[in-house]
Structure formats: structure tokens, C-alpha cells
Amino acid sequence: MEIEPQPDGITCGPTCLHALYRFHGLRVPLAQVIDSVQPLEEGGTLEVLLANDALARGFDATIYTFNLNLFDPTWFAEPDVDIAAKLRARAARKRGKKFGVAVEAYCEFLGRGGELKFTDLTRAQLRGLLRRGAPVIAGLNVTYLYRHARVSGPHDDPDDVHGESCGHFVVLTGYNRDDRTIAVADPYVPNPVAEEQLYWVHIDRVIGAILLGVMTYDASLLILERES
């Protein structure tokens, strides 16, 4: 799995998306992907905004979400629930620009034919997704993944007392059953885990980091396939 270093502190998402495009045979410059993915006003992006870019390029996109800030578990209990309508109804009662962007992006995602799933994130599920052979973009809490101090200020300086945890995108590329580790392709380099961009992390830590991504509107997995 090849992944380029992210050019700055806020382009981890497009850099991961670029790696998946390259894996699936789409050759496009990283700068073009960065320009085409919708950013958030405060920097960074959302997994669903990555998915919308992929849908616009002719991919099939599936998001596994664990984000209870946006979704209610009961919406997935029956097959005929209009999730877009539920999201808009929630947006009418809940303020926040980031929330509004997320709602509109998910409505676009569903309208374009994107598939949204809500499941239990278990070892078996994650292993099963990786055994398909295609890489998976994970939106997660990188403070938990790195076991690094929280950060504060415009330069994300370490601040264990006053800081906040951070969201991040990485690509999950494989599983080692002998030591139960996940292969991670990380666009952020250097990082506190390894000197290289490709490293292995125990599956339980990866699962914890994904679920804690709910703190930063992440907590999701994105899988792309080329349309047949």
C-alpha cells in the first residue's frame, strides 16, 4: 500500500483518499484530490465528504458509521427509514455549523447512492472487511491511537491539561492473525508511533480509536469499489 505524506496538518483525509484512488487504478495528482474534496471551515474534512468525492468520480462508496452525534441506532433497525429526512429533522433542532455541513453531506451521499451501515465494531467485523483485500479509510481519534498528549493552539502544541483530542484519517490495509495487529498506512509523518508511514497496531487499540472518533465527528470506516 503506497501513501504519500500529507502536505500539511489538515489534509490527511484527501491524502488517504488519494491512496485509495491509486490502489483502485485511478491516477490523479494528490493536489487535485485536495482541491476537489470539500474542506471544513476550521480545517480538515469529514469521511462523508471524501465519499462524495469518490461517488462523483464513479466509485461505489460504503460508510460504516459509529457516530451517535449524527445518527440514532433506531434509524437502522428497519429498512424503510428515510435517514436523510431524519437527519434534516435533527438539524432543524440542533445548532452548529459543522453539524449542518455533516447533515447536508450525508444527504448528498445517500442521494448519490452511497451505502450507509450501522453495526457493532468488533474484531471479527474489522478482520472480515480487511480480508476482502481492499484498503479501508478509518476516521478515528488519533490521540488515542498515538497515545499522545492532547493538543492546543494554532500549531497543535502538546497540552495534556488544557488540550483537546484530535481526529485523523488513516488507511487500514491488512491483518496479522499471529499477533492480532492491523497494518496502518498513515499520511502523517513523522508520527509518534513509528518512523515510517506503514506500521502495525493491535486491533483492540484500532477499534478503540475508531469508536472514540465520535468526539471529533469521525468514528467511521469508508470502503470504495469501482462501479461494475
Give short role names for the model-derived ranges:
Residues 28, 118-121, 201:
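Short coil/turn linker and secondary-structure boundary residues
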Residues 5-12, 81-83, 162, 180:
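Short, mixed-charge, low-aromatic patches
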Residues 45, 49, 121, 167, ...:
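Short, well-structured alpha-helical interface segments that form or flank functional binding sites
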Residues 55-164:
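Predominantly the structural core of cysteine protease catalytic domains
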Residues 128-137, 141-228:
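Noncatalytic regulatory segments and standalone regulatory/sensor domains
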Residues 29-32, 49, 98, 125, ...:
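Exposed alpha-helical structural elements
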